[in-house]
Amino acid sequence: MKNKILIILFTLLFSKIALAENVNIQAKKISIDKKEETTIFENEVRIVDDQNNIIKSDYAKYNKKLNFFTFKKNIILEDSKGNIFKSDNASYDKNNGLFKTLGKSSIVSSEGYIVETENVSLDLINNIASSKNLTKIIDLEKNTIDLDNFEYLSKENIFKSIGKINVKDKIGNKYEFSQIYLDEKQREIIGTDAKAFLNQKEFKLDERNKPRVFSNAVSIKGGQTKFIKSAFTLCDYREKDKCPPWELRAKEMKHDSKKKTV
């Protein structure tokens, strides 16, 4: 039948670990180059590996010698943890369990966090995804997190990053950090070397006020923000970052965005 989906079962032998593993491949079109030991799959390609990772694409090329896949166009990888990765160019080093995207990529985590980034490296053995490129994450509380890079530990449901980090919540409060942890299960953001710029009018005695909190660490969870070893001021910015005329210091300070209190 012309449109019949071809199903091919490859038994792949790994010399390093001396195990035989199966990969199921489906496609509507297939061509084989025996000399080069490569196989090309096109149209509705679907691959399921031994770890139940599912890869779909318009095009896939398999190199038998290297045990290596190359993918193009409309690539969707759903890993065994339920995370979904999308890109238009990717590769899969089956021997090392390493899946890589090239160019613009997106992720929807198993907990519903949305990630926009580039050049993702996914270790399917250790369940770790990472990118050294600029990244935007939107969490379930509609916080937008802009990062220089990220690492995602999918077993622990934790994102982490070190570098220039900016967070903006749904009511316009802005935070700057040098290091951040996003705990998906707890729906919590933890950051260090924090600067918080509060947007709520209730904190302003005058339109010129710039309510802000600087602290060693911050925890943001469920509409409440906890500042550790912090300083709070309403005063306007001063030239050359001089200290404000007054500030309130505390070992612990809390900001409730719903009650609009500090």
Segments and roles (model prediction):
Residues 4-14:
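Sec-dependent N-terminal signal peptides
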Residues 20-262:
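Structural signature for solvent-exposed beta-strand/loop edge elements and short helix-capping sites
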